[in-house]
Each structure stands twice: as structure tokens, then as C-alpha cells.
Amino acid sequence: MPAPALERQDSGIDVHPTSAHFIQQTLKLYATKLKVDASAEHHLPRNYMSRYDNFAQTDRMKQRSLDGRSEGLTLEDVREAATAAQPVFNETVRKLAEAADLDPDAVVLFEGKPLVKNAEKGTVYSRLMIGPLKGEARCREKTRDDYGGDFGQLLDVVRCSIIVDTEEQLIAVTRLLLEGGNVVRLKNRFKYALFTGYRDALFSIVIETPSGVEHVCEVQLH
């Protein structure tokens, strides 16, 4: 759906170039949203995810240092705990994918071709994508802008993405996560899409480190 051009001569209104650019960009964004919405209706006809509301167990949404502290944490405290949680998290999400009958290492296909992640590097998306720890600069920026300087609220230093092909796979992973009892927050953007129409689901899950300290990690479901 091409964005309509502004017709100054028809309306007789002199539109400032900045305003005209803003309007055109808004129309393009809206056209993109309509395409995304149409794609979602095509690929998610049963709307299974609509049954799940967002929720948050705020009393458990706080990181701890490896010595058990939850107050006055530094970024180093959080990253040290994240490093300890990472191997346990990796094993947990691989088992999760396999329990949903997904091959964690399978290459994701789009229109019959591997879905490219980085063309220059020649990398493609796999069913399970486990990222490195969130970078220090981004952690500091997010803590400053979103959490008032409280590093203990960083819940996605350890994270992964699971990419599915079907609505049945989507609901299978969701059910396994929720039935596991370790989800402390769900942001269900399949039900509550972003203004662009983009949809996914973000699960904050508790992982226990080898020393027994809980660490909150993120599973992104696409």
C-alpha cells in the first residue's frame, strides 16, 4: 500500500517541508503496520496467544549478587551472576526447544531460503539463538534511562531467541515455559502488538546458578 503523496495544489495549504516529511513518514509507517497485521492474521489464524495476558511477579523481578545481596548492586555484581547463570540457562533453553519438538540448531528458512542474519559475515538464524551477555555500555545506558540507576532491574543480561514456523510451535513453547513455574514476567506482544504491528513474546525466567542464587534471564519468542 503506497503512501499517498501530499497534494498541496488541491488543498491550497502551504505545508512546511518538515511537516510534510513527518506526515509522509507517518503514512509509510501506517502502511507497514497494515502489512504486518495482515501477515499476522495469515500466519496466526487461531490467535492462540490471545489467551495469555501480560503479568509480572514484581517481588521476584530483582537480580542478586552471587553472595545473595539484592540492594546496591553494581553492574559488575549483575554480570558476575549472569556469567554464572549462563551455562545453566543455555542447557535449559536447549531442553525447552527440544521438548517442543524443535531442533535448536536447525537453520530457519524463509520462503524456502535460510533466513540471513548478517550477509557480510554469512551468518543465518538458527531455531535457537543464544546471545552473548548484554554489553556493558548498553547495560549502563538502559539502567540510566529506564531504571533510575538500579542495576538490579536488568533482567535481560542473559537472553536468547527461539524462532518458530507455526502457531502450534508458538503455543507449545509458551505452554512449556508457563508450566515450568519459573516465568516471573510475560510481555505478550502477540496479543498487545507494538505500534508498528511487530509481535513477539518476552518471558523473564528464573535460573538458579550452581551456588543457589537465582538470576532472571530472558527468552524471546518469535
Could you describe each region identified by the protein language model?
Residues 1-154, 171:
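Charge-rich, low-complexity segments
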Residues 143-222:
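Long beta-strand-rich cores associated with HINT superfamily self-processing modules
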